[in-house]
Amino acid sequence: MPPSGLRLLPLLLPLLWLLVLTPGRPAAGLSTCKTIDMELVKRKRIEAIRGQILSKLRLASPPSQGDVPPGPLPEAVLALYNSTRDRVAGESVEPEPEPEADYYAKEVTRVLMVESGNQIYDKFKGTPHSLYMLFNTSELREAVPEPVLLSRAELRLLRLKLKVEQHVELYQKYSNDSWRYLSNRLLAPSDSPEWLSFDVTGVVRQWLTRREAIEGFRLSAHCSCDSKDNTLHVEINGFNSGRRGDLATIHGMNRPFLLLMATPLERAQHLHSSRHRRALDTNYCFSSTEKNCCVRQLYIDFRKDLGWKWIHEPKGYHANFCLGPCPYIWSLDTQYSKVLALYNQHNPGASAAPCCVPQALEPLPIVYYVGRKPKVEQLSNMIVRSCKCS
């Protein structure tokens, strides 16, 4: 039996003759020679935003402003809006992972907390309002050699039975034995065990860049000013079990752990090259003359562009949009473009080349009136912060 390549040769000959005899010209279905009308693109983006805002607020049309009281917004409403805006701004400062790393499959690793009986916990004993979870960073670095490879990190805790409702807070071990607040959780009474999960991606990235041998978390009872009982009533698997033998081993395997999702180094070697692509975010795109896929600036003035007076804060915002060609391995000025043209002809519903689309989006807080009542809302995914080819 002839090799498979020889069996396919009769099928490939007509296509090869087509490539030789057809004059060299770009594939008609893939031409990008048309001039982009930027004003038309912006108008379409503005109209899309009009519908997006109304849809997110579940409004069929802009609300009437006939009953809106004159004068400035109430101080309490303005304070709520400002705090929401500041929180969103603070969250956007967090570094984004490399866009290229998102493409690769992620390897999942579990790193167990150092056993609670270890002597490194001695200085934390005698604190009934807190539990301490320490991790050996050498195990973290073995699983994730470089911070850029980390996609996500979760702290997982197995909560056992809880008789009373309790508000708990999670802290990160910081410099000089201080503790930095991370998040909180309200735990309801339950007769069955439950896994708790906290996103600690940013924290673990920090640990990977530092050289501390031991890092950790603290789970504490919420300290309320009007409560005299600050005891942590939550029982977490892996602490003071009192078990021996096989039961102790099983109990220890379910002690708190970090679940790490990271790109294996061998799958992402190009991330460490000095030639790796820049993140297509506002920091790069707004300060360059990039012609390919990038974030393009677009400021929406609610009154001027949408004819709206019902949104009282902000007066407008930078919506931005993604635009630009995505470089493709089969260039249009090569003979391979004819193969792509045939592919397009037989697969009209498929995309032969990647498109420039949003990657990171930010929310937009607004203040508007419903009748005489002011409302503060946060609209998700309203600001394009970075783009990618997909």
UniProtKB/Swiss-Prot annotation:
Region called Bowtie tail, residue ranges: 226-252
Region (Straightjacket domain): 30-74
Cell attachment site, short sequence motif: residues: 244-246
CDD domains recorded: TGF_beta_TGFB1
Glycosylation: residue positions: 82, 136, 176
Record PROSITE patterns: TGF_BETA_1, TGF_BETA_2
Keywords associated with the record: Cleavage on pair of basic residues, Disulfide bond, Extracellular matrix, Glycoprotein, Growth factor, Mitogen, Secreted, Signal
Cellular component terms (Gene Ontology): blood microparticle; cell surface; cytoplasm; extracellular matrix; extracellular space; microvillus; nucleus
GO molecular function: cytokine activity; deubiquitinase activator activity; enzyme binding; growth factor activity; identical protein binding; protein serine/threonine kinase activator activity; type I transforming growth factor beta receptor binding; type II transforming growth factor beta receptor binding
Pfam families recorded: TGF_beta, TGFb_propeptide
Disulfide-linked positions: 285-294, 293-356, 322-387, 326-389
Keyword Signal: yes
Any one Gene Ontology BP term: mammary gland branching involved in thelarche
Residues with site note (Cleavage): 278-279
Post-translational modification: Transforming growth factor beta-1 proprotein: The precursor proprotein is cleaved in the Golgi apparatus by FURIN to form Transforming growth factor beta-1 (TGF-beta-1) and Latency-associated peptide (LAP) chains, which remain non-covalently linked, rendering TGF-beta-1 inactive.
Extent of the signal sequence: 1-29
Location of region: Arm domain: 75-271
Stated role: Transforming growth factor beta-1 proprotein: Precursor of the Latency-associated peptide (LAP) and Transforming growth factor beta-1 (TGF-beta-1) chains, which constitute the regulatory and active subunit of TGF-beta-1, respectively.
Family, similarity comment: Belongs to the TGF-beta family.
Subunit structure, interactors included: Homodimer; disulfide-linked. Interacts with the serine proteases, HTRA1 and HTRA3: the interaction with either inhibits TGFB1-mediated signaling and the HTRA protease activity is required for this inhibition. May interact with THSD4; this interaction may lead to sequestration by FBN1 microfibril assembly and attenuation of TGFB signaling. Interacts with CD109, DPT and ASPN. Interacts with EFEMP2. Interacts with TSKU; the interaction contributes to regulation of the hair cycle. Interacts with TGFBR3.
Record-given protein name: Transforming growth factor beta-1 proprotein
Source organism (scientific name): Sus scrofa (Pig)
